[in-house]
Amino acid sequence: DVLQVQSDYSNTFNWGGKKHAVLTGVDYYDDDAKRNQNYANTTPRPTTTVGTPDNGVGVADGRAPVQWNTFQARNVGLYFQDTISLTDTLKLVAGLRYDDFKASYRNPNGSLSSDRSDSLFSPRAGLIFQPDALSSYYLSYGTSYNTSGDTYQFSPGLSNSTARSANTPAEKSRNIEIGGKFELFERRALLGVAAFYSEKYNERNTDPDTAAQQELLSGKRHAAGMEFNLAGRMTPKWEVFFNHTWIPDAKIDQSNVARNSTGTGAQVQGDRPGLTPKHSGSFWSTYAVTSSVRVGAGLTYRGKQNPEGQRSYYASGFSTVDAMVEYAFDEKTSLKLNVSNLFDRVYADALYRGFYTPGAARSVQVTLKTRF
């Protein structure tokens, strides 16, 4: 069960001879979950003779009863941000977020196996330069945390009682970004270009000396690249939506994970992190052929990548094509045909260490829409 509540307050005022735009608020998150462990049947399988299946031979169910591990977490967040107009063209952005996080884990017997409590501050700052009404440039710096008290970091396999990850402080990340936004084609379209450098430090790694009991905040990784976004009307009849992420540089800078003798296993220091393709993005475009007929097509693409935690496997890059045609009977009623994955491409959508989830096959959808 998940409960989430958020409340914001914003206002603008003049103080100290400067204009201030303030955003502040509070959010609350409560998560109550259960996780069970999978137990295989340990009873030996008897032999039987082909052609005589009904000979009384059976297999007893030797699986252990399901054991539930309970996870409970609560987080209260407070945040404040002020955008100060230093001049008519230059703005300073400064903000701070505070999180109070608590989590507990209980084993199948109901006793407390582990708990975690963190008080975290996340500052951010930036500059915005707007030389005219059609363009703006920005520089930003921000930090964030990834607490070790979450359901998927719970390690029930350790005697069903010890969550080693829960005893590890939060991971930290920081991001630096510089970019610009530009209004084009008589303000019908918006172009965004940004360069970024993201770094995760204090990354969780298994302690090689006490691997069964502890994890260390000894890892570090980074990624650097650029993002491109374009959305809007190139002409009154032609719409384009495009985004592309290019990450030429990504590396695990520090790790105590050792490369095994066969060169397989988890990524090690110097490797490119998993789930980090060099190129990914999408493109979609529509064109009004007549006042009643509109056609569209686009593609989604992603480059080659490894799953997280496995350096010897990878999924090849792929692209899928979508298409659309729409007919408007009048201003209120329209009929639209969408075809997703037009060429029925087989690809790996989600990657894991031992398997992958295939992407959706070709699908056709017809939508009749009317307004009253």
Q: Where in the sequence are the language-model features?
A:
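Surface-exposed loop/turn segments flanking beta-strands in extracellular/periplasmic regions
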Residues: 35-67, 114-115, 157-166, 210-217, ...
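Residues on the lipid-exposed face of transmembrane beta-strands in outer-membrane beta-barrel proteins
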Residues: 5-11, 78-84, 125-129, 178-182, ...
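Structural signature of Gram-negative outer-membrane beta-barrels, strongest in the C-terminal barrel
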Residues: 19-23, 27-29, 69-200, 233-235, ...
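Gram-negative outer-membrane beta-barrel transporters
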Residues: 88, 192-199, 217-309, 343
